[in-house]
Amino acid sequence: MKTPVRALLITGFAVACAGPSADVTLGAAGPWNEGYGAMNKRGIDLAIEEINANRGVRGRPLRLLARDDGADGAKAAAIALEFVQNPAISAVVGHVNSSTMVAAAKIYDGALPAIATTATSPDLTGISPWVFRVIASDSATGVELGRFARRLGHTRAAILYENDSYGRGLADAFRRSFDGTIVSIDPIPSGNGDYEPYIAFLKTQSPGLVFVAGTEESGMAILREARKQQFSVDFLGGDGWTGIVGEPAAQGAYVGAPFTASDERQEAQRFVAAFKARYGMTPDGNAALAYDATKMLAKVIEEVGPDRTAIRDYLAGLNERRAYRGVTGVIRFQPNGDPVGKTVVIARVNRGELTVAGSR
């Protein structure tokens, strides 16, 4: 099957370079019905609305072809092939999940530039010179979270992780960086599963902190179960937890977030105000990163046009002077596609908001 697929990719790429359409078009893929996916989509849509309200890109409307990959690798690969073969699409915003981006990257390689929004797996580092991301890798984030847990004064920690690219990578980085005793490491089901036995077991291990490498859905369920069993320890999650703020049981939990709405920088506050006005809610890191990726691609196309190779080359060649200055910070890329200098903000859930946390 390898030869026919490669032939299709080459054919699709050749067609895509044949000439521009009347509009400039971006592809986007993610699990739009999930909480974090919906936030990604809102960030993308807001960016496009603002761009089109300001003469579009090169005086032409910026359009979006969005596809729902359901956080499924096979669907993501099929969507990637569709995007590659569509001559109107100049670049892709997404994918959102690590596993779907890994699957899609093999299709985009050599054919279509893509900027992952919230895909953090170390497996993406260097996967293709056509794939970039605007969020730090788990290998960097997990180290920061492990060190933060130690700064909180904890010497005993437990780890729960979703058994996928994201969960495994983040959990391993935390484990390696936590300068204390790891009392247990356990894989957990994704989604709104039954976490009663996990919390019951953790209570027998007496950790001071539980690190959870998973998404907001499993995170909220775990925190509810911990409250139910009166298991009062510190909980810490990665960027997958940025959407847990509305859960009452999340009060006091720590989150390694790529962005917080309390960021006082002018560009960040402009984005927060615009997002609240448009959607009636506070944006999280998912929305901010997707917004930045979309605005960044629009700026690149404004500079070099809709040609795919020109876009890829411009992204790869960004230096400190030409770096994109977005709501999540300054963005340029290492040769392996990871962002330069991107870090996480350690925040704490406080009455439905994320506020920057300090060590105690």
For the regions a protein language model found, what residue spans apply to each?
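Extracytosolic ligand-binding ectodomains
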Residues: 2-13, 17-360
